[in-house]
């Protein structure tokens, strides 16, 4: 939050709590700075759920003295408008009016599944944010195309080049699974391929993991399989890796090769 820029793109692992944080920050800005804030989710059901479970829940649990000092003027299932003019709105898009803060949750998913909606967000909601405002895009990866992929790639390149950003440039943030201390479990034996993988992470990227973290990764991978790197990337480039196109049994054959189960044809 302290490193926040005008335009922020956050590539992340799953379940790190960013949307919850944004809901709290937006509520704070609406209450104490009279700012107009909006949060966009990929479905209206999710937008309303976030509003109910994050924003409204936080507001209802504020001390009464704060709520009385700036009471709600308008309340719906998608919006809170306060007497000071500040507001928090959730939706699947936003067009018209002016915003000081905009957050788009799972923008990568929106780009992949609803490309026209993504275009509407870029052409409508982005343009509603004033020059001093803040836009934040947050998502796990969803393929190697679309606005989220393009913004992430360019922002990471700018970061690596130490480019001095303008207000129109995106600032890149990456948060991996191993940065969450909760992603840990009792140590267990690992297959050789994962031992080699973790050794490579340490040698090439300086990422040192505990045995408990490695075991958590192994356990989670058993369920996710080929989607593990997309959902829980260790480094940014992993997030956008794709399985071999057209290889229906790629994972199974990879396993057979690693177990030396592929042999020369046997004689009749």
Question: For each predicted feature, which ranges?
Answer:
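Phosphate/NTP-binding elements of NTP-utilizing enzymes
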Residues: 1-268
């Amino acid at each position: 939050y302290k490193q926040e820029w005008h335009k922020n793109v956050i590539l992340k692992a799953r379940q790190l709590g960013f949307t919850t944080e944004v809901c709290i920050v937006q509520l704070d800005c609406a209450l104490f700075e009279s700012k107009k804030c909006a949060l966009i989710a990929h479905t209206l059901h999710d937008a309303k759920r976030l509003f109910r479970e994050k924003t409204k829940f936080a507001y209802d649990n504020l001390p009464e003295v704060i709520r009385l000092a700036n009471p709600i003027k308008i309340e719906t299932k998608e919006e809170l408008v306060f007497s000071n003019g500040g507001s928090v709105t959730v939706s699947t898009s936003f067009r018209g009016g002016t915003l000081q803060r905009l957050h788009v949750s799972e923008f990568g998913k929106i780009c992949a599944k609803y490309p026209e909606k993504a275009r509407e967000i870029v052409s409508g909601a982005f343009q509603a944010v004033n020059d001093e405002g803040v836009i934040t895009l947050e998502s796990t990866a969803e393929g190697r195309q679309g606005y989220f992929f393009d913004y992430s790639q360019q922002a990471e390149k700018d970061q690596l080049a130490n480019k001095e950003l303008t207000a129109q440039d995106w600032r890149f943030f990456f948060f991996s699974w191993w940065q969450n201390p909760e992603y840990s479990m009792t140590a267990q034996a690992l297959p050789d391929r994962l031992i080699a993988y973790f050794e490579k992470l340490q040698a090439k990227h300086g990422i040192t993991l505990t045995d408990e973290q490695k075991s958590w990764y192994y356990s989670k991978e058993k369920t996710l399989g080929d989607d593990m790197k997309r959902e829980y990337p260790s480094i940014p480039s992993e997030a956008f890796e794709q399985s071999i196109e057209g290889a229906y049994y790629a994972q199974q054959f990879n396993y057979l090769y690693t177990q030396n189960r592929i042999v020369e044809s046997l004689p009749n």
